[in-house]
Amino acid sequence: MISLSYFNDYGSFDFYLMPYFIERVFPGTKGRPRLAFEVDKNNVIFESSSKKNKVDVAIRYSTVIDDFDIGISHFYGNNRSPNLTFNNKSFKLDQYYPILSQTSLDLQSTKGAWLYKLEALLADNGGEKHFSIAGGTEYTIYGVRETSSDLGIVIEYTFDDRNDFAFNDEGVIALRWTQNDINSKSILAGLLSDLGGNSNRFFAEFEQRLNDDVKLFIDTSISGNIDQNDFT
């Protein structure tokens, strides 16, 4: 990858050139977790005639206006996530990498103990257009019970106009605890609920630095109910 950054009074510009594409690696028959069928790594199709040799490009502009951090990005190149199609002859999943053209916007503002965030994305994935948006707020209680710990209350909403998977219209409520110690110990736990159906899921994340070079992450997810009309 080749990157170039330019800064001026109006903000910063970042340019990226990615001259060689690396296919996504999927778990084999003995790998976990994996899909119900094996992904055929020998049957890969690209929309681009240049295939792996296509030069992908990306650009990002970011600036600060008053209390708002603003970023605008665009990417054009091979999609990093292939479309998987079942092959009736091999009983495996064939890979197809379409050309992805997507533009995104991100906003963030901090006002006292309140943090506000908004992200929006418009993409054309091999001719299939879709839109997604995510926004939310977090209120932080500093120095809980006169300690160094902070407690954040998180509320988020996300929407994706693709209806072929679960949690495409969801609300999230969570608590974030941060100890603010030398090990950067923190816990995030909450409930995710599909507002367009009956699906819900509990999640928890724990992280702690073990030493200067090693950090521990533990993620847990428990599905309470998955709507029969959702694909996961």
Language-model-derived ranges and their functions:
Residues 1, 152-172, 193, 199, ...:
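Outer-membrane beta-barrel translocator/channel fold
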Residues 1-59, 232:
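Surface-exposed coil loops of outer-membrane beta-barrel proteins
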Residues 2-6, 59-63, 105-109, 135-139, ...:
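Residues on the lipid-exposed face of transmembrane beta-strands in outer-membrane beta-barrel proteins
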Residues 8-10, 17-23, 65, 76-80, ...:
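Transmembrane beta-strands of outer-membrane beta-barrel pores
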Residues 10-12, 64-67, 127, 142-151, ...:
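Short loop/turn motifs that connect adjacent beta-strands in outer-membrane beta-barrel proteins
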